[in-house]
Amino acid sequence: MGGGRVAHPVLKGPSVVKELVIGTVLGLAAGGLWKMHHWNEQRKTRAFYDLLEKGEISVVVDEE
């Protein structure tokens, strides 16, 4: 019985191009989510000030 040979994968160093592509894609995805979050907050703020200007809401507590 001879020792069986197991084919081991040859490990290579990191691929610079692959790392750049992955980093760019992740950065753009995170930036897009962040931008959408800010657009949503801006929309809510604009709606609040529009209602405040129309007089439909007030930030002053009415005293009875």
Swiss-Prot record:
Domain of life: Eukaryota
GO cellular component, one term: mitochondrial inner membrane
Bilayer-spanning residue ranges: 15-34
Signal peptide: none
InterPro entries cross-referenced by the UniProt entry: COX5C
Keywords: Membrane, Mitochondrion, Mitochondrion inner membrane, Transmembrane, Transmembrane helix
Transmembrane helix keyword on record: yes
Localisation per UniProt entry: Mitochondrion inner membrane
Chief localisation class: mitochondrion
The family this protein is said to belong to: Belongs to the cytochrome c oxidase subunit 5C family.
Known function: This protein is one of the nuclear-coded polypeptide chains of cytochrome c oxidase, the terminal oxidase in mitochondrial electron transport.
Name by which UniProt lists this protein: Cytochrome c oxidase subunit 5C-2
Organism: Helianthus annuus
The gene coding this protein: COX5C2
